[in-house]
Amino acid sequence: MNIILALKRPFIWLSRVRHRCGYGVHSPFAFELITCLFYEKTPYYAYKELAQEEKKQKRNHGKGWRNESLKVKRLLFRLVNRIQPGTIIDFGTPSSSSLYLQFGKATADYTFASELSELFLEADVPVDFLYIHCHQSPVLVEDVFRICLARVVQQSVFVIRGIHYSKAMKNLWERLKADDRVGITFDLYDVGILFFDKTKIKQHYIVNF
């Protein structure tokens, strides 16, 4: 984690506290997501198994295995478990989040890539779920977003890590959520979540996650 961001964390939390628990959210879809998915505390059956598998993978991969925030990893699991995507694209540095994505729906067509040259998308196959976690390179984030944007369908969901990591990432997040093809978005600080269901009114929500 960026050290400066870590030091600022308590102040960031306080500045966003009014956005907790869905206060002021009138959209039934957004309110249900915030209260029943983002803040869900259910001890899923898979959490224990995931923790055990993480230990094994960490031993196998060593320092090349990035250990991300448990809160974010569990959110990824819950999102995939709820949406049940047919395809999952995981783009970034090899990390333990890959386990949570795959456990969310074991039968999904899961693809990992760390470079654009590895991002092979079969013709006419939609991108149902995209997780981008290479926020140290905003240009790469945008490139991956644009490539996968051409494959979105109504139920697609994109999750972008580090939207507040730098000024460049903040500016990029503003551009992405303003795209005409994007619908409802959520700023959870650690991640930004974009939906593409245009049957719902486009709105941008801040959530103190």
Protein language model regions, located:
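A short alpha-helical cap/connector motif
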Residues: 1-131, 135-154, 164-209
